[in-house]
Amino acid sequence: MTVIQHLIKELKMIAHPEGGHFSESFRDENNNVSLIYYMLQKNEWSHWHRLTKNEILHFYKGDPITIFMSKDGIDFTSVTLGENENFHFVVEANNWFAMQSNGRFSLIGCTVAPGFDYADFELAPKNWKPKNFTLNNTKI
């Protein structure tokens, strides 16, 4: 069993609608806060989406992960989480964002307060991306 298979099994992860795998590890009884494990493997993307709440992303294990963000749907910025990078980052409410692992896999945690609710989640149309989005200086 590979490390990836082991983590998916041990953390009881399932496929996430935005891509990758996840499992909820904590939600308080009043839904004041929720926490999930989230994993992306090589060649997987967290599809562009946004929340109406701030989301804190925490790096746990594996390869660095890049978070791409856009406030206006035109321009974008990025930040990398990883062992020799940032350990956590806050994606502010209503910002579009997507993620990609920079290696075999990346395991992160995602904390939302008040707790996550799919009513606060918007998944962008399938081929949507910020107008000026580039990857490795190649406009896509």
Question: What function would you assign to each model-found segment?
Answer:
Residues 1-90, 98, 103-140:
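Non-catalytic, conserved peripheral segments adjacent to functional cores
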